[in-house]
Amino acid sequence: SERKVSGTMEIAIAYLFNNQGYKNLLEAKKILKKAFEGVFLTDEDTTISLVWRKSESFQETIEGQMDVEVCGSVLTFDAYAFPKHSYLPLDAVGSLAKHIDENWNVTVINNTELDEIWKPDDEEVVVYTRLDSMQPGTFPSTYACTWFTNNIKVHVISGSDVNADQFVMNLLQDIQERERFVMNDGSPFFVNQLAYSTKLDPLKDGHVTVRG
């Protein structure tokens, strides 16, 4: 399912309304959009990614100075959160993240130490796992155990679509062959369905689904 936007960030810039000011405004808009588009901000609780949504231009007179006009623009970025979650006593989401972290040279959000401000380049692949849904399992519960079915979304992000797609293929093949991965208590998570859609956005939606 598509996630909601977690918030927005707006940057306002303005220059004196003349030929040089207008040129400076156009250049500043390009620089700021490039600087913040696709940037990740991380603290101890969550990671946020910024995605440019729109730029709105304006022209107005400075209050109290009727002969001074400025031209400017407001750049709006959507913020998507990648928060830490813990699903105890059995954490399928964290266990899949750990499995990925241990088997591939990728950056796993909330499983890897990250800088406060960073942006994946063409060589780096970034992965985030989250719980999409949970239902009672198809097997009947017993006194020894209770079964649940989890849908886990995997977000795969990179500056290179080729590298992101290659990792997705490797991940799907690995899980398809193993048919399981180890949970945090040592028990297996049995995978019964894998899905990959190129129509889904890796930041908003997560284009890989692991069901089991």
Language model feature labels by segment:
Residues 2-121, 132-212:
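Charged, amphipathic alpha-helical segments and their flanking helix caps
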Residues 125-128:
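A short glycine-rich, His/Asp/Glu-containing loop-to-beta-strand
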